Amino acid sequence: MKQAVIVDCIRTPMGRSKAGVFRNVRAETLSAELMKGLLLRNPQLDPNLIEDVIWGCVQQTLEQGFNIARNASLLAGIPKTAGAVTVNRLCGSSMDAIHQAARAIMTGMGDTFIIGGVEHMGHVPMSHGVDFHPGLANNVAKASGMMGLTAEMLGKLHGITREQQDAFAVRSHQRAYAATIEGRFAKEIYGIEGHDANGALIKVLQDEVIRPETTMESLAALRPVFDPVNGTVTAGTSSALSDGASAMLIMEESKARALSLPIRARIRSMAVAGCDAAIMGYGPVPATQKALARAGITVADLDVIELNEAFAAQSLPCVKDLGLADVVDDKINLNGGAIALGHPLGCSGARISTTLINLMEDKDATLGLATMCIGLGQGIATVFERV
């Protein structure tokens, strides 16, 4: 079977969704700039070789509608001979884009793909136009469509305290801020034009969402937002609302070597799994177990892990049940996560994978895992191997 490899991976800075640096920048522009960036960074690649552009996006309406993958690829000047498709696996959309490209390569259906994802949550809110079928109530509780309440449920089932959640959130901001000031995000962030608070055009080179001032005391002052009476999940222990995009150049290994392109990682295994929608945040556990089995490894073999922080209350049960509680500070989300950086839905899968690959290089690691939960009860996971 042919091997799928990551040649390059980049992301935009993460902008605040409320009056942030990308308030005047459209989702198609964020996407197109990354597509152009991949080609500029890899001049050996003839753009005419691109088979397909596979782009994750959840709210496919307004500026994100009518196949944003194609709109952005045309904006980027990618040859019209390349295909383009927008995919939606909710939070796992751009990781699913990775999987789609990898499967195509492994089965001989193309050897050069640009993949990624975007979500401009400031322009297209997560709940915009959502209308669940009334018949779903026969199988799924109404609260299962409210992600914060599913996090409350998962936290209660696993005995996760408010203090544990607050500590996890503080860690996320501290780690992300340290990664910023120490330049550890510099390799993955591709600067994008935006606007400062006064409306002046600027080149955005750092994440806007991180709050380094976050402390246990400041989080303790926040009220539960989803279950105000009995809940423990606050805005501070939930992923921030942010705008951003991520992108990868994925190729068949021998093709990349023939063009003298760098091979940053190989896709070792992939998996998706379902779980009860009421505890959607538990999805990374069965998805990871599948991916590890397919790779022929155990969780102990993993050197670095990126677990998307949708909520602290869902991340901590996954850490516990995957047997990772003792290695959090050594292996998991070493540069912070979505609580600090935000979770632009269609962007996050390729974003955490990009961060993972850079961490693997920094630590000279061999095996890494990127995994995330998905609304309405799914999980997705990818094992990467440096070669």
Curated annotation (Swiss-Prot):
Pfam families: Thiolase_C, Thiolase_N. InterPro entries: FadA (IPR012805), Thiolase (IPR002155), Thiolase-like (IPR016039), Thiolase-like_sf_Thiolase (IPR050215), Thiolase_acyl_enz_int_AS (IPR020615), Thiolase_AS (IPR020610), Thiolase_C (IPR020617), Thiolase_CS (IPR020613). The active site is at C91 (acyl-thioester intermediate), H343 (proton acceptor), C373 (proton acceptor). Its main location: cytoplasm. GO terms for cellular component: cytoplasm. Its EC number is 2.3.1.16. Keywords: Acyltransferase, Cytoplasm, Fatty acid metabolism, Lipid degradation, Lipid metabolism, Transferase. It is found in: Cytoplasm. GO terms for molecular function: acetyl-CoA C-acyltransferase activity. Belongs to the thiolase-like superfamily. Thiolase family. Heterotetramer of two alpha chains (FadB) and two beta chains (FadA). Catalyzes the final step of fatty acid oxidation in which acetyl-CoA is released and the CoA ester of a fatty acid two carbons shorter is formed. This is 3-ketoacyl-CoA thiolase. It comes from Shewanella sp. (strain W3-18-1).
